[in-house]
Amino acid sequence: MQFSKMHGLGNDFVVVDGVTQNVFFTPETIRRLANRHCGIGFDQLLIVEAPYDPELDFHYRIFNADGSEVSQCGNGARCFARFVTLKGLTNKKDIAVSTQKGNMVLTVKDDNQIRVNMGEPIWEPAKIPFTANKFEKNYILRTDIQTVLCGAVSIGNPHCVVQVDDIQTANVEQLGPLLENHERFPERVNAGFMQIINKEHIKLRVYERGAGETQACGSGACAAVAVGIMQGLLNNNVQVDLPGGSLMIEWNGVGHPLYMTGEATHIYDGFITL
């Protein structure tokens, strides 16, 4: 099987062309390939498939390192766009793809940046999914070690966002897995820890479900900005600094799609026998 190793701000991926080669992965195979000592090593596996809808260009599938399939990965979306362009699978600047939970448009810009239309944030608790009687800007979550206030939103996948005073000392290692597996998130959740520098600049760490803390999480950056805007803490254009680098997030509020812009880097191509 041919593959490419790529990363978006240090969030690393193996990307596989499922259009021109036949590929099938079991969860066990994915876990073996994801192993950084005995396999290739990655945060997520991305598969490019032929479109299910003839009006779209591709179908986009995402698997976490633990073998679980998820419906969204923002950093992966940028790498997906870079991959299909580099491999000559398309020459379009605007690439329309489907995912498990909807469609998105990936735009390849001339300055090596990829702009992704992430769609509208979803706030209705049942659709996140999150257990709550109604939408609120802040929810109280109790864990074994502390009670936190968080915002909850879906960016095609579930996120909770906790505001912290100092991103460096935030208790991500202990609190992250407790939030990820909290009973009020029936499909688990990506936990974001956000420090607000000013209304147009935040710092963020994300503990991703099925992957742990990563160098960057594109949908997590989108979720943090969306929550901050809904809470009246942020403006419409925000720079998000993650451990692996920075993203620009734009959102004009309810009823509008959210946009993420950032880099996508090709590292190497390889071949492996499954």
UniProtKB/Swiss-Prot annotation:
Matches recorded under PROSITE patterns: DAP_EPIMERASE (PS01326)
Alphabetical keyword list: Amino-acid biosynthesis, Cytoplasm, Isomerase, Lysine biosynthesis
Main location: cytoplasm
GO cellular component, one term: cytosol
Native source organism of the sequence: Haemophilus influenzae (strain PittEE)
Site positions for Important for dimerization: 268
Pfam families referenced in this protein's UniProt entry, alphabetically: DAP_epimerase
Superkingdom to which the source organism belongs: Bacteria
Protein name per UniProt: Diaminopimelate epimerase
Entry-linked InterPro entries: DAP_epimerase_AS (IPR018510), DAP_epimerase_DapF (IPR001653)
Family the entry assigns: Belongs to the diaminopimelate epimerase family.
Function text: Catalyzes the stereoinversion of LL-2,6-diaminopimelate (L,L-DAP) to meso-diaminopimelate (meso-DAP), a precursor of L-lysine and an essential component of the bacterial peptidoglycan.
SUPFAM superfamilies listed in its UniProt record: Diaminopimelate epimerase-like
Broad class of enzyme this protein falls into: isomerase
GO biological process: lysine biosynthetic process via diaminopimelate
Molecular function via GO: diaminopimelate epimerase activity
Gene from which this protein is expressed: dapF
